[in-house]
């Protein structure tokens, strides 16, 4: 029998409301906004088709394979409450559609061409369920939370960081000086800004050398292990690896990568190198807002966060809940759990559409950074808990007495909050009081409290 040529509705093949999802399926929740006149079933089925085996017309070669085995299926559709003409379409993809250990391939399918599809006004990937049968094909984070604490010998509190500012324009020697002052004052880490790569005013090798000198000097004087996130992001993968190898030769504990601008392929290679060579890997999410900021189109950050845990990174920026960058508390805590925990229950109030079981993949430490200062410390300690990095750029370097006192102020504020919490005090209610008490015996903290007493980024 010849095949039946012509165009037929996607929903005849790809909308299967009776389908029972398999444990090995990758599940996706899409927020679909169909064009006027396109029924939601057709829109959901179109997404399933275009992101798996479908094309716009029936083709003769369909007969050479088993669509039933390989097609994506839209198995459930629900209306989004409070939005006009928006639906959540749930799609199940058979495991065989994806190359093992490749976030790149997973995204090329799931969020590839389908996002330019005419029948849809907008499309957003809200969440993915990664089955253990797929996640087990990834190395994941180079080290994870416990190994990092053991390497650094730091327990029972959040870690403190600072991005060196001005982010562009300092010479390598002045940059190293700022690193030393911050680490000497009491921070655990300092950070290259995400756009510091290797520019004419400061070439990467000079920066690496001066920062390493700063790290070793601060370590010797404080008796604590210190780190600086040396940004290895580069224009080619070869150049990126060259920078990572040089960092390893210098004996530093941690390097950094911009995983979205650098790309998942480069990031995964770097993560493998970091595990093999004992380097921690700090991940910055520059470019994420291009993808995740629109509520009806793109991808939610929780998907980018899951992808990073698979590709590999030990720290990732994840919003602050309290600073200058967007982030709603419950949603933020939702993806913070997805980064850190082994097993996360489905919870729609926190934006988690699927129960996610990471089995034993190491966790990633969330980094809170952006417009935060000493008065935020109690809230940050309570919201993020011990397994986090709190990063104060302006909140350290903007101290009226300089960088080292700025670092002292942050460390004193943090230790005061941790001690108060361990004594059973309520950080949410008594936060300001705790900071005030601590500032009585720390002039550096008192000066910081004075400068930032009124600032809030409310819009």
UniProtKB/Swiss-Prot annotation:
<feature type="binding site">
    <location>
        <position position="285"/>
    </location>
    <ligand>
        <name>substrate</name>
    </ligand>
</feature>
<feature type="binding site">
    <location>
        <position position="163"/>
    </location>
    <ligand>
        <name>substrate</name>
    </ligand>
</feature>
<feature type="modified residue" description="N6-carboxylysine">
    <location>
        <position position="191"/>
    </location>
</feature>
<dbReference type="GO" id="GO:0009853">
    <property type="term" value="P:photorespiration"/>
</dbReference>
<dbReference type="InterPro" id="IPR036422">
    <property type="entry name" value="RuBisCO_lsu_N_sf"/>
</dbReference>
<feature type="binding site" description="in homodimeric partner">
    <location>
        <position position="113"/>
    </location>
    <ligand>
        <name>substrate</name>
    </ligand>
</feature>
<dbReference type="GO" id="GO:0016984">
    <property type="term" value="F:ribulose-bisphosphate carboxylase activity"/>
</dbReference>
<dbReference type="InterPro" id="IPR020888">
    <property type="entry name" value="RuBisCO_lsuI"/>
</dbReference>
<keyword id="KW-0560">Oxidoreductase</keyword>
<protein>
    <recommendedName>
        <fullName>Ribulose bisphosphate carboxylase large chain</fullName>
        <ecNumber>4.1.1.39</ecNumber>
    </recommendedName>
</protein>
<dbReference type="InterPro" id="IPR000685">
    <property type="entry name" value="RuBisCO_lsu_C"/>
</dbReference>
<dbReference type="GO" id="GO:0009507">
    <property type="term" value="C:chloroplast"/>
</dbReference>
<dbReference type="Pfam" id="PF02788">
    <property type="entry name" value="RuBisCO_large_N"/>
</dbReference>
<keyword id="KW-0150">Chloroplast</keyword>
<feature type="binding site">
    <location>
        <position position="167"/>
    </location>
    <ligand>
        <name>substrate</name>
    </ligand>
</feature>
<feature type="active site" description="Proton acceptor">
    <location>
        <position position="284"/>
    </location>
</feature>
<keyword id="KW-0456">Lyase</keyword>
<feature type="binding site">
    <location>
        <position position="194"/>
    </location>
    <ligand>
        <name>Mg(2+)</name>
    </ligand>
</feature>
<feature type="binding site">
    <location>
        <position position="369"/>
    </location>
    <ligand>
        <name>substrate</name>
    </ligand>
</feature>
<feature type="site" description="Transition state stabilizer">
    <location>
        <position position="324"/>
    </location>
</feature>
<dbReference type="InterPro" id="IPR017443">
    <property type="entry name" value="RuBisCO_lsu_fd_N"/>
</dbReference>
<comment type="subunit">
    <text>Heterohexadecamer of 8 large chains and 8 small chains; disulfide-linked. The disulfide link is formed within the large subunit homodimers.</text>
</comment>
<feature type="active site" description="Proton acceptor">
    <location>
        <position position="165"/>
    </location>
</feature>
<keyword id="KW-0488">Methylation</keyword>
<feature type="modified residue" description="N6,N6,N6-trimethyllysine">
    <location>
        <position position="4"/>
    </location>
</feature>
<dbReference type="GO" id="GO:0004497">
    <property type="term" value="F:monooxygenase activity"/>
</dbReference>
<keyword id="KW-0113">Calvin cycle</keyword>
<feature type="binding site" description="via carbamate group">
    <location>
        <position position="191"/>
    </location>
    <ligand>
        <name>Mg(2+)</name>
    </ligand>
</feature>
<dbReference type="GO" id="GO:0019253">
    <property type="term" value="P:reductive pentose-phosphate cycle"/>
</dbReference>
<dbReference type="InterPro" id="IPR036376">
    <property type="entry name" value="RuBisCO_lsu_C_sf"/>
</dbReference>
<keyword id="KW-0479">Metal-binding</keyword>
<keyword id="KW-0602">Photosynthesis</keyword>
<keyword id="KW-0503">Monooxygenase</keyword>
<keyword id="KW-0601">Photorespiration</keyword>
<comment type="function">
    <text>RuBisCO catalyzes two reactions: the carboxylation of D-ribulose 1,5-bisphosphate, the primary event in carbon dioxide fixation, as well as the oxidative fragmentation of the pentose substrate in the photorespiration process. Both reactions occur simultaneously and in competition at the same active site.</text>
</comment>
<feature type="binding site">
    <location>
        <position position="317"/>
    </location>
    <ligand>
        <name>substrate</name>
    </ligand>
</feature>
<dbReference type="InterPro" id="IPR033966">
    <property type="entry name" value="RuBisCO"/>
</dbReference>
<keyword id="KW-0934">Plastid</keyword>
<keyword id="KW-0460">Magnesium</keyword>
<dbReference type="GO" id="GO:0000287">
    <property type="term" value="F:magnesium ion binding"/>
</dbReference>
<dbReference type="InterPro" id="IPR020878">
    <property type="entry name" value="RuBisCo_large_chain_AS"/>
</dbReference>
<keyword id="KW-1015">Disulfide bond</keyword>
